[in-house]
Design a protein with these regions (language model features):
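Generic detector of intrinsically disordered, low-complexity, polar/charged segments
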Residues: 2-9, 55, 78, 114, ...
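Exported/periplasmic cell-wall-interacting domains
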Residues: 78-174
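Gly/Pro-biased beta-strand-loop elements
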Residues: 12-108
Length: 174
């Protein structure tokens, strides 16, 4: 069962601030399990791709236009799972790492990590540690996140590959 709870001591108050100039816009394709981060161009439109990578999508992820509202370094998402670099969205979804068994870098759930690029039974929008950390550090409160069924991803945009890990590997390789 998802609790969505976090101790206030876990919340990084620095990340409550509004992103500088609302620099980024995040778009997620449900069909492609892909997240693309865009930045503003000279015409003040979000058209310049900055990052593109695969994500795992939880069972409740649905089309929505939302925004980052709060962040936590670690968040307990169920009775047995935690995620790191968690960015909560206004629609109650989360952008975060794959799941961990405890609040330890050495206790990754390898099955969750290897599911990046697919649907998963737990969590919201899961990604590698490096990508979750990038969003955590660069996309502040009120950064728009648009979740859509599908959109065309230009062939110019390189979507990062996922290197699968062994079933007994408990550390994110990124």
């Amino acid at each position: 069962e998802t609790t969505g709870e976090t101790d206030s001591s876990e919340t990084d108050t620095q990340t409550q601030t509004i992103a500088k100039n609302q620099s980024y816009y995040i778009r997620i394709s449900i069909a492609k399990h892909t997240l693309v981060v865009y930045q503003l161009d000279d015409n003040k439109e979000f058209s310049i791709p900055v990052k593109a990578f695969k994500v795992a999508l939880g069972p409740k992820v649905a089309p929505a236009k939302t925004a980052i509202s709060e962040k936590s370094l670690w968040r307990k998402i169920t009775d047995i799972y935690y995620v790191r670099y968690s960015s909560r969205l206004d629609n109650a979804e989360y952008l975060s790492t794959a799941t961990y068994y405890s609040q330890s870098d050495n206790n990754l759930n390898p099955k969750s990590y290897n599911a990046i690029g697919q649907n998963v039974s737990e969590g919201s929008i899961l990604m590698t540690c490096a990508n979750a950390k990038w969003i955590y550090e660069n996309c502040g409160a009120k950064t728009t996140v648009e979740i859509v069924e599908n959109f065309d991803i230009s062939s110019d945009i390189k979507v990062e590959d996922i290197n699968r890990i062994a079933d007994n590997a408990y550390r994110d390789p990124t």
